[in-house]
UniProtKB/Swiss-Prot annotation:
<keyword id="KW-1133">Transmembrane helix</keyword>
<keyword id="KW-0325">Glycoprotein</keyword>
<feature type="transmembrane region" description="Helical">
    <location>
        <begin position="154"/>
        <end position="174"/>
    </location>
</feature>
<dbReference type="InterPro" id="IPR018732">
    <property type="entry name" value="Dpy-19/Dpy-19-like"/>
</dbReference>
<feature type="glycosylation site" description="N-linked (GlcNAc...) asparagine">
    <location>
        <position position="32"/>
    </location>
</feature>
<keyword id="KW-0328">Glycosyltransferase</keyword>
<protein>
    <recommendedName>
        <fullName>Putative C-mannosyltransferase DPY19L2P2</fullName>
        <ecNumber>2.4.1.-</ecNumber>
    </recommendedName>
</protein>
<keyword id="KW-0472">Membrane</keyword>
<dbReference type="GO" id="GO:0005637">
    <property type="term" value="C:nuclear inner membrane"/>
</dbReference>
<dbReference type="GO" id="GO:0007286">
    <property type="term" value="P:spermatid development"/>
</dbReference>
<feature type="transmembrane region" description="Helical">
    <location>
        <begin position="52"/>
        <end position="72"/>
    </location>
</feature>
<feature type="transmembrane region" description="Helical">
    <location>
        <begin position="107"/>
        <end position="127"/>
    </location>
</feature>
<comment type="function">
    <text>Probable C-mannosyltransferase that mediates C-mannosylation of tryptophan residues on target proteins.</text>
</comment>
<feature type="transmembrane region" description="Helical">
    <location>
        <begin position="299"/>
        <end position="319"/>
    </location>
</feature>
<feature type="transmembrane region" description="Helical">
    <location>
        <begin position="182"/>
        <end position="202"/>
    </location>
</feature>
<feature type="transmembrane region" description="Helical">
    <location>
        <begin position="233"/>
        <end position="253"/>
    </location>
</feature>
<keyword id="KW-0808">Transferase</keyword>
């Protein structure tokens, strides 16, 4: 999974070497290190001409550019430069918990992380604008590919992203046409990653790919689901249940058909953390504290930097607004189902289709009046 990262950086290294050789620039310094006999002297080098230094340098450059991207992202979300500055400061204050690039720069996630931030910014841009411009969608596809190629766990992060966007689509926060384009771009990015990884079947048998296929199917059957005649809440529950069950079933079916066995399964890591299940692969990951349960010191650090309190306050506001919006939609839907009547012009009469003892007579009278005015 990491070969693509090395291939890309190797191509950049050869391009860089061609440029510095063309201009005769000296970007490498070497010296001999004397060691105690019987060990011989060894040469040690630093500078961008050295492949190892170039590799680490590229990682640090990408993460440096990410700071500028955080500023742009925060400015766009808040509408002011102050918001971008606060975003960067919050990242600095929580730098030790947000990334490990300063300790282990060669890690695959250190290379992918900047592209994830770019992907989130592009996705936010798409969700907040109503333009039909294709360039943001193309940028979303390319940033997805750049994020997935170096890191095998990127698909799980994108899966959680789709799992967050799908309920927003179901309850009506995202336009169906826009959400359909987002799903198409994600499907194209999976296909491109599959091709660029020389046919790695893990991309096609992941939860991410299965969720995309299920989302696409539910979007196509949206009208049929709405014609079932059920309430709004039941319609949401049907789509949500179909998405979850279909994603899990499709994931296991594609794994069986393609004969793919993940070298490390997310369910194994969860079982290792909760049930203390162990094997060679889980021990390889869980020996690191990053994959263990959150320590109490971590919560204390988040509180000292005000990250945890601010996130909790924002989460409460979002939850309150979401519950209020959903309650209003459900209340309106129940009222309409109770009082809706189908009016047709036949001697100026109105035939009630959905009525009950709870319907207001004024609503039925208004329906008859509107029918009479239309066909008078």
């Amino acid at each position: 999974m990491a070969d693509s990262r090395r291939v890309i950086i190797a191509s950049w290294y050869r391009t860089f070497m061609g440029i510095v050789n063309l201009f005769g620039l000296e970007t490498k310094t070497c010296w001999n290190v004397t060691r105690i006999e019987p060990l011989n002297e060894v040469q040690s080098c630093e500078g961008l001409r050295d492949p190892a230094c170039f590799y680490v340098g590229v990682i640090f450059i990408l993460n440096g550019l990410m700071m500028g991207l955080f500023f742009i992202y925060g400015t766009y979300l808040s509408g002011t430069e102050l918001g971008g500055l606060i975003t960067v400061l919050c990242f600095f204050f929580n730098h030790g918990e947000a990334t490990c690039v300063m300790w282990t720069p060669p890690l695959r996630e250190s290379f992918s992380y900047p592209f994830l931030v770019l992907q989130m910014y592009v996705l936010t841009l798409i969700l907040r604008t109503s333009s039909n411009d294709r360039r943001p969608f193309i940028a979303l596809c390319l940033s997805n590919v750049a994020f997935m190629l170096p890191w095998q766990f990127a698909q799980f992060i994108l899966f959680t992203q789709i799992a967050s966007l799908f309920p927003m689509y179901v309850v009506g926060y995202i336009e169906p046409s826009k959400f359909q384009k987002i799903i198409y771009m994600n499907m194209i990015s999976v296909t491109l990653s599959f091709i660029l990884m020389f046919g790695n079947s893990m991309y096609l048998s992941s939860y991410y790919s299965s969720s995309l296929l299920m989302t696409w199917a539910i979007i196509l059957k949206r009208n049929e689901i709405q014609k079932l005649g059920v309430s709004k809440l039941n319609c949401w529950l049907i789509q949500g249940s179909a998405w979850w069950c279909g994603t899990i079933i499709l994931k296991f079916l594609t794994s069986k058909i393609l004969g793919v066995s993940d070298h490390i399964c997310l369910s194994d890591l969860i079982a290792a953390g909760i049930l203390r299940y162990t094997d060679f692969d889980t021990l390889k990951y869980t020996c690191s504290p990053e994959f263990d349960f959150m320590e109490k010191a971590t919560l204390l650090i988040y509180t000292k930097t005000l990250l945890l309190p601010v996130v909790m306050v924002i989460t409460c506001f979002i939850f309150k607004k979401t519950v209020g919006d959903i309650s209003r939609v459900l209340a309106t839907n129940v009222y309409l189902r109770c009082c809706l009547c189908r009016c047709h012009a036949y001697n100026g009469k109105c035939q009630a289709v959905y009525t009950s003892s709870h319907c207001e007579s004024s609503t039925l009278r208004r329906c008859r009046l509107e029918a009479w005015l239309q066909h008078a």
